Amino acid sequence: MATRGKVARWVRRGSTLLLLMAIGAVLLFSQCEQFGAVPSGPDHQRMTESPNYNPEKDIFVNETPGVIDEMLAHSGFWANPRKNLTNNFLFNPNTPTPNVLLPEVRGQLPSDLRDTSDTVKFTWLGHATVLASINEKTILFDPVFSESAAPVSWVVKRYQPPAISIDELPSIDFIVISHDHYDHLDMKAIKFFRESGTRFLVPLGVASHLEHWGISRDRVIEFDWWQTRDIAGISFTCTPAQHFSGRTATIAMQKTLWSSWALRTEATSVYFSGDSGYAGHFKEIGDRLGPFDLTFIDAGQYNERW
């Protein structure tokens, strides 16, 4: 009985310690600038008018029902805590890690980058970051230049620097964002453009993050799926994706919209997928806006947990 009593006391103490640690973590991270801002006021009102918004749950949803619920069911930590503590992309000791830099071509951007006439010039900078010149305008897709894709610098670290540093970039006319995950929306990169004339094209809700980081709202255009704006001779259409969003794990998931993008001029057309699982929206995008001369499609991020 005495032994059981000691065990019970240790369990209570351990539970209390874990609770205090959890509260401390919440208090710490609630003040983290990296988290951005959850849409409120007029921003939230615009969200509620979207056909992709679920008013009962106050979140955005995918066209395919139950996709996120299925993902969360597979990724539940407590289903197998011993396995899931190490079998994830944050703390998995078996994750293959390159011991040499991957092959790349580094060099100065051409002086005639903007002289595209009826063509598209582009440079892949790593992961989802693409620099493109379309219709004599420079466009940067999902710019990420930080050393890690997380709110803290010691996890999700990149294996090698981007092919071009942020300081080497030419003047950028437009930055196009697909969603607010850290490997696609980089706070430090966004802040780099605070004093520039760059305009931002983002899915619904993401403008709240940018404003929180010092970007004036008159430089940001928010889109719902299938909305189109013609700017500087380029037709920008925000197109669907099958994914999710959030910068605070499960605390504020799906509070901003995720998307892909279709760009078209009189001479050419480009598709940028962002992150997306395979679903019927790919065919619909092709039927409605294709064919495309050039596509940028993220691949390889599949896992049984998502």
Predicted features, each with a name:
Residues A2-A150, W154-K157, P162-A163, P203-G274, ...:
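Metallo-beta-lactamase
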Residues H184, S208-H212, H281:
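Phosphate- and divalent-cation-binding pockets in alpha/beta enzyme and binding domains
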Residues S117, L125-H127, P170, I177, ...:
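Extracytoplasmic
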Residues K137, V144-S148, F223-T228, G233-F244, ...:
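Conserved catalytic scaffold of divalent metal-dependent phosphoesterases
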Residues L140-D142, S171-H181, L201-P203, E222, ...:
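Active-site neighborhood of phospho(di)ester-bond hydrolases with catalytic His/Asp-centered motifs
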Residues W154-L201, G290-F296:
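Active-site metal-binding motif and surrounding structural segment of the metallo-beta-lactamase
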